[in-house]
Each structure stands twice: as structure tokens, then as C-alpha cells.
């Protein structure tokens, strides 16, 4: 027998999370997660799932019937879209302007499909003209995949225009909205988005570990008419939706849902609906403007041009001669404040300051600016 390990209960300090995610969680959401666990087929829980589906539809601004939360983080939402829709040998136009566009490419190739890359410089949005050129050059392409809000750089791409191009050239669109949902304008039905995924831990200010997804009727038809089986049993939407949708008043067991995490997502989306999604978009922009003014006063420069800058993810260049890790460590130690390091091509060159969900508040902006001023001077 192995000896029993002895540890104290883990009791972390209260941090101010102003990095690229997770974000500060609403107190009401933490309280919701602590409520009594019930069975995942309990009638009361099933009724809550129906409400949760409606709340996800509201956040995405869609009436898509195939809308639900994947029982895993945003990366699983990404895989859900690719593994359900893309078949071996199919061609996918993949837009790559940061880390998460590259992850899309990897997903495409892992399902045996062909990725046609449209590369844009890090810190810039996806270029619609380059996308149209790729669509013209590849008339057999079935999908256009892009990141709406690139978390690695803070760049916002024009999803409305890109999805219109996909439709024009007969492609389905697959959109990463992990950082954009709840933080900037996003209208799934109006913009004609076919498959979209997000994460619970960014602008929804929920606990990490869930991924809202939605498929358009056209995407559902593509799934129904696959020539090959979906390669993942766990992520197979044709199976999962039998749990999320009542067929003749009965739900089919697929897996044990993360019951308490779904309580939390229900509460975070309920708070979003209570605030109003357009008001949430405006709040993120308003707080960004306050942060921007303070950062510029400190002489800090943004990675992304103003016209394509995410309000909820602010990437700023690290001043010359400043120790990246030392600054972040001191912010955490002295102020309980977390900001993010650069990722990929921006590693060691930039910090990423998040203003997401519950974190997009004046007191957080004031703390961040004061802390940076004191640490840098």
C-alpha cells in the first residue's frame, strides 16, 4: 500500500485576473456552482438545460436548434466543429494571424483534411481580400475557418465580411469566438455564421471548462450527410444533442454532464441577459478607452492598430530594458494582479491585459494602471 499523502485544503488568495483568461468570476457564479449537485437526468436539471440553451442562443444571437455547451473548454469546442463537419480529403481555407489560427490548421490536418493557409502578420486582422483570393483559387474548398478575436495578439477580424465571402463562394464558415463572445459585437444569424465555438472563462466570467457551440441548419445538414463516421465519440454532436434535446419528452444519456459547472454557466449567461448583450459590448469598449488613455500616458504602445483592436484583450509592447517576468511576478506578489505574458511570436515582447466580463470594471482599470506605474518607475 502507498502511504496516504497529507495536505492542507487548498485555499488560494483572491487574485485580480487581468490576463487573457480565465477572467474574474462573478460572485453569483461561484455561489451558483456551490449549490447542491443533482443527477444529470434530474427533471429540474433538464429544465435548467433548456433555459441554458436559450441563454446561449441569446449570447450568440442565434435561433440555431443545435446550440449547447460542450463539457470541456474552448479547445474542445474547436475540435467539436472540425471533427463533426470536416471529412478526410476536404479542403479548408484557414486564416492564420496568431496562435489560434494555427491551432485551426492543426485540427484540419488531424481530421485528414487539406488546409489552405491565408497568413496575415501577427497583430493584424484577417485580410478579406486575401481570403477572397484564396477562395477564388480553390473553388473546391468546403469551409472557411478564422478566429474572430485572436487572443494571442488582441486583433479583431471582420467576421461579418468574412462570412459573407464564405457564402458567396459556397463555403461553410467555422468561427472561433472564444474571446469575442460577450465582449464585442457578435451576431451569428445576421452574419451567417455556420459553426461557432467559445469558452466559459473569458468575457462570460464563468468558471473554466465549458464551451458554448452552435451549428446553423446548413452545418447540421453537412453533419447528417457525412460519408464517414465522426472520429470522436465524445464530441459527436449527433449523439450529444440527443441529451441536450428532448425527443418525445425523453433525453438520451450520453455522458455525465458537469452539473455544477453548468449551474455556473447558466448563472453567468443569466447575468449577461440581465445586463443586455449590447450593454455588455459597450461596457467593454468604455473600459478599454479608460485603460488605453492610462497606458498611453505611461508611454506604453499597443501591438494592434486602433481600428482592429480588441477592447477586452489589450496587447502592449514591453518597454526596452524591462524584465517581463520580473514585472509580472511583482504585480502578482505586491498587488495580487495577474496580467498575461506574450504568446508565440510575441513571447517576451508584449504583455496582454484583459478586460473581460466581470473584470471590465473601473476599479480594475485603476488598479492596473497604478500598479504598472509604480512597478515600471
Labelled PLM ranges:
Residues 189-201:
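Conserved active-site segment immediately N-terminal to the catalytic lysine
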Residues 32-80, 99, 103-109:
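Conserved N-terminal alpha-helix of the aminotransferase class I/II PLP-enzyme fold
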Residues 86-102:
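Conserved PLP-anchoring active-site segment centered on the Schiff-base-forming lysine
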Residues 10, 345, 349-377:
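PLP-dependent enzyme catalytic core of the Aspartate aminotransferase-like
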Residues 301-334:
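Conserved PLP-binding catalytic core of the aspartate aminotransferase-like
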Residues 1-43:
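N-terminal "arm"/small-domain region of PLP-dependent enzymes with the aminotransferase-like
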Residues 24-25, 201-293, 297:
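Active-site C-terminal subdomain of aminotransferase-like
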